[in-house]
UniProtKB/Swiss-Prot annotation:
Keywords: Cell cycle, Cell division, Septation, Sporulation. One of its GO terms (biological process) is sporulation resulting in formation of a cellular spore. The keyword Cell cycle applies. It comes from the Bacteria. The keyword Cell division applies. Gene3D superfamilies: Stage V sporulation protein G. SUPFAM superfamilies: SpoVG-like. Signal peptide: none annotated. This is Putative septation protein SpoVG.
Length: 97
């Protein structure tokens, strides 16, 4: 299984969420609402989840092994950092320093 596309939208919120992503797996299956979170130990990817009636969050979809989780996290965070670099270049080109 390969992550064949990542669509990412940065968000400006008061909390720790930095972006929301959608990934495509093997050009055949899309997972929406993956969140990039700024945690205590750096950025990490949180899979889509739903709040249960007792207030807990349960994943709607998630990888079942660490190798797949790493592939997803690496692809999403690579795109997150790439977009950050593009925004910095656009900011500099606009004349701000």
């Amino acid at each position: 299984m390969e992550v064949t596309d990542v669509r990412l939208r940065r968000v400006n919120t008061e909390g720790r969420m930095r972006a929301i992503a959608s990934i495509t797996l093997d050009h055949e299956f899309v997972v929406h609402d993956i969140r990039v979170i700024d945690g205590n130990n750096g950025l990490f990817v949180a899979m889509p989840s739903k709040r249960t009636p007792d207030g807990e969050f349960r994943d709607i979809a998630h990888p079942i092994n660490s190798g797949t989780r790493s592939k997803i996290q690496d692809a999403v965070l690579t795109e997150y950092h790439r977009l950050g670099e593009l925004e910095e270049v656009e900011f500099e080109e606009a004349g701000a320093s």
